[in-house]
Amino acid sequence: MSALRILILSNTPWDNSNSFGNSFSNIFFGIDDIEIANIYCRYGEPDNCIVKKYFQITEKSLIKNLKNSSSPSGKEVFIEADSTDLNEKEQIAFDSARKKRWQIMFWARDFVWKIGRWCSPELKAFIDDFKPDVIFQPIYY
């Protein structure tokens, strides 16, 4: 019997140092005959021994894609530090906006995701290549 392929969608990268990554690593650790891929929508680098494949989509990549359609809206991430992180200036702006929690920032983020071309050929190829049996998205509140 072939391994069960599970595709998990998340906001944050699957990192054992954050609550999502720690919880899901504990849930899936030690289960034989599964393969897991993770599509995540934030900056950062995954860090765990469970997931085999990653795909990252960020607001920044969506905005770049809206400005220039040849710029990819997402990319497959390999553990060798291939994920997109913010530079120091961008990180300060991002943290400030997150702390202030202005409603306009939520609207702007929703707008970018609404008009953004997130369903890209790269994302479709990633999903087609992985061929998931189950797609799972945790509900965050």
Question: Positions of the model-derived regions?
Answer:
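Short His-centered aromatic/hydrophobic patch
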Residues: 138-141
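Conserved nucleotide-sugar donor-binding subdomain of glycosyltransferases
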Residues: 77-134
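N-terminal subdomain of nucleotide-sugar transferases
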Residues: 1-79
